[in-house]
Amino acid sequence: MASSLEKLISSFLLVLYSTTIIVASSESRCRRFKSIISFGDSIADTGNYLHLSDVNHLPQSAFLPYGESFFHPPSGRYSDGRLIIDFIAEFLGLPYVPSYFGSQNVSFDQGINFAVYGATALDRVFLVGKGIESDFTNVSLSVQLNIFKQILPNLCTSSSRDCREMLGDSLILMGEIGVNDYNYPFFEGKSINEIKQLVPLVIKAISSAIVDLIDLGGKTFLVPGNFPLGCYPAYLTLFQTAAEEDHDPFTGCIPRLNEFGEYHNEQLKTELKRLQELYDHVNIIYADYYNSLFRLYQEPVKYGFKNRPLAACCGVGGQYNFTIGKECGHRGVSCCQNPSEYVNWDGYHLTEATHQKMAQVILNGTYASPAFDWSCSGSESVDKEYSFSS
């Protein structure tokens, strides 16, 4: 009798212990976010570069047709409408994340976005020392992070929650960042082998920023990879060649440029795995921007795009509707009638329709690793296809 009772108690304790482990694991994966903190470049810039610009020399993103599909008037976003970060905010039931520069009242409640058009993962001084001297934004990832650290104490004093708790309740979007570290030398004519030498340094810069934010209390990171650059009108124009073997016969993209993007992504995933093992109390999610976009080039019609996905919607000239020096927003440059039928917006950036398609498959876990449990995020929809506002 006593033996049976002991076994029963032992079994109960084992079940209780197992349940505790499952609950703890579930809590570590499933978090109700109260804000989004964003770092990066134009892929996530919601107006920073616009507010940093000279009022007499405003960027193209300050004028139509930028923003024509949603924001009316333009908001400084480099697209015809919403970005991936906007769709993530919608899904989480959070406000669109305002740009830090130009904001009157910066707060955790609204979220904060430090992403700036043209930003690099590596500091400007370092890139110039490597002979990369393009006229890029001097707001690298480390500069963005330092600004955040400087304002963090003020953000916390206005709330009953402490800094670590507030940052722990935030989804931290780390980019995309790093593509400009490669864009500039590519457009200066440097070889792929030369540019490959930058990849470990770019990965280290991203990793260091994540570690700094973990030390500050960050618990959930969404870290995007690089894009299939060989499918972009700007690159297709720059590296245009009549040789058929230089292009993928199925998509028309340039394989060697896409392989470079994949090389960056493999290095990034390896580093994120290392960080996850080192900091097992946080969630580090890799967002596969490469494949979530590349599938649209593979089967454009299936996803509602024209059967000519390599051309820019807004641009002029050539096979890809793109001419360097006559980009979208310049006089005499026209825009397509229906941006939702195009993958690419202006040669360098994507349309709102593309951003939506990418956000859907990242949020549903198809192109996120590991897939995140959004069931307690506050969103009403956790199905395969998410319903965003229009």
UniProtKB/Swiss-Prot annotation:
Q: Which residues are glycosylated?
A: N105, N138, N321, N364
GO biological process assignments = lipid catabolic process
Task: Give EC number(s), comma-separated.
Answer: 3.1.1.-
Coarse class of the primary localization is: secreted
From the UniProt annotation, give the residues forming the signal peptide: 1-26
Query: Which superkingdom?
Result: Eukaryota
Keywords from the named record: Glycoprotein, Hydrolase, Lipid degradation, Lipid metabolism, Secreted, Signal
GO cellular component terms attached to this protein's record = extracellular region
Location of this chain's protein in the cell: Secreted
Give the positions the UniProt entry annotates as the active site.
S42, D346, H349
Task: Say which enzyme class the record assigns.
Answer: hydrolase
Query: From the UniProt record, which GO molecular function terms apply?
Result: hydrolase activity, acting on ester bonds
Give the matching PANTHER family. SINAPINE ESTERASE, ZINC FINGER FYVE DOMAIN CONTAINING PROTEIN
Q: Which family does it belong to?
A: Belongs to the 'GDSL' lipolytic enzyme family.
The name under which this protein is listed is GDSL esterase/lipase At1g28640
Which species is the source of this protein?
Arabidopsis thaliana (Mouse-ear cress)
